[in-house]
Amino acid sequence: MGKLSNIRRTKMLAQEGRCYYCGLLMWDPELKDAAPAICLAPAMQKYLRCTAEHLHPRSEGGANTSSNIVAACWYCNTRRHHRKAPPSPDVHRAHVQKRMAKGKWLAARLPSTVTVGGRASLSKESRLPC
């Protein structure tokens, strides 16, 4: 594992396995642990894969340092950078949270999403099967 992988994993653990932007549980393919039960469907595993999100993008001189990286799910990370001018992390986080509250972000793709402690999660009964 490289330095970036170690930082990503450390951040993921510090964030209790939750995406910096949407708060959904993520998984790390390099860990032996299975994807969280929040979603076992292969397509959702892609969306919820943990990535190292550079708060200050590398393309703009951002470094691979712990202070510049948070753990974010693939979906939130790619959506931030698909724009012509990616918004700041704070602006993107507010945007994601607003869309989540309206059921118009990744959580809308998951069945029976509920909010627990301000974070989206799924009830045991509504988790997708393998």
Residue spans for each PLM region:
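Short, charged surface segments at domain edges that flank catalytic/cofactor-binding sites
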Residues: 1-39
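The −1 position to Zn-ligating cysteines in a subset of zinc-ribbon hairpins
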Residues: 17-18, 51, 72
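Histidine-centered nuclease catalytic patch
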Residues: 26-69, 84
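Glycine-rich, phosphate-binding/catalytic loops in enzymes
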Residues: 36-38, 89-92
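Short Fe-S-cluster ligation motifs
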Residues: 47-66, 99-126
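Short Cys/His-centered divalent metal-binding micro-motifs
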Residues: 69-91
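Glycine-rich beta-alpha-beta "Rossmann" dinucleotide-binding loop(s) and their flanking helix/strand
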Residues: 95
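N-terminal pre-domain and mature-chain start segments
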Residues: 128-130
